[in-house]
Regions:
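Extreme N-terminal, non-catalytic leader segments
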Residues: 1-9
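Hydrophobic positions on the alpha1 helix immediately C-terminal to the Walker A/P-loop
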Residues: 23
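Walker A (P-loop) phosphate-binding loop of P-loop NTPases
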Residues: 17
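N-terminal phosphate/diphosphate-binding loop that engages ATP/GTP or pyrophosphate donors
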Residues: 29-95
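Small-molecule kinase domains that catalyze NTP-dependent phosphoryl transfer to phosphate-bearing small molecules
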Residues: 74, 119-126, 133-142, 162-208
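ATP-dependent NMP and nucleoside kinases share a basic, alpha-helical "lid"
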Residues: 90-162
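Conserved lysine of the Walker
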Residues: 20
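Hydrophobic anchor at the beta1->P-loop junction of P-loop NTPases
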Residues: 12
């Protein structure tokens, strides 16, 4: 696919608790690119559905709810932000209800189409580090800068527990990798990094080195 946008996109994908969010945020700061957390967008829709009493598995009602909601994506302090009818959902995005609902929300094709459009729009205005589960495979398949961050199931479960989250890593992996629309996959040309025994700085350093090898102009960084 030819690049339709004027800015650089670094795609970082991976399963839950692989460390991709922390890595993507740190890389964005190092490069002075905008950090975009696409998972937060799906979590925002899950929160909205729960707030309005709409079952996350009811695709038709979720789509209708989104149709009548002002969903605004913007950038503040170098990171993506979300407003739903003027309300910032950020404080609610890691609740137990949202954790239990987000995979169902992410499996709704019309939701993915809407959010993919919003995600691609960032690259018309900014150089971005964008993380999620289908950035390199579906949202920006044309970018040459693709990374897949993974870790062992044991390490990922421990990280979730340290975050105060008790949801099942195995169940979430199954949901994400078997959904019909944009499942979690490793993009064919992605560079895979196992973060199990690496610090955030170590993963960022490996990505940085790979970007240099790919010829990304990094200036004096």
């Amino acid at each position: 696919m030819a690049r339709e946008h004027p800015h650089i996109v670094i795609a970082i994908d991976g399963p839950a608790a692989s460390g991709k969010s922390s890595v993507a945020r740190a890389l964005g700061r190092k490069l002075r690119y905008v950090y975009v957390n696409t998972g937060a967008m799906y979590r925002a829709v899950a929160w909205l559905a729960l707030e309005k009493g709409v079952p996350p598995l009811d695709a038709g009602r979720v789509q209708q709810l989104l149709h009548f909601t002002e969903f605004v994506c913007d950038v503040r302090a170098g990171e993506s932000t979300i407003l739903l009818d003027g309300i910032d959902p950020a404080p609610h995005l890691v609740s137990a209800g949202v954790n239990a609902s987000v995979s169902a929300i992410a499996s709704i094709p019309d939701v993915r189409r809407l959010l993919t459009k919003k995600q691609r729009a960032f690259a018309f205005d900014y150089d971005v580090v964008m993380e999620g589960r289908d950035i390199g495979s579906a949202v920006f398949p044309e970018t040459p800068y693709k990374f897949y961050i993974d870790a062992s199931a044991e390490v990922r479960a421990r990280r979730r527990a340290n975050q105060g989250l008790q949801d099942s890593i195995a169940a979430r992996d199954t949901q994400d990798s078997t959904r019909r629309t944009s499942p979690l996959v490793i993009a064919e040309d992605a560079h895979v990094i196992d973060s199990s025994n690496l610090t955030i700085e170590g993963v960022v350093g490996e990505i940085f080195g790979r970007l240099k090898l790919k010829g990304l102009p990094l200036g004096e960084l």
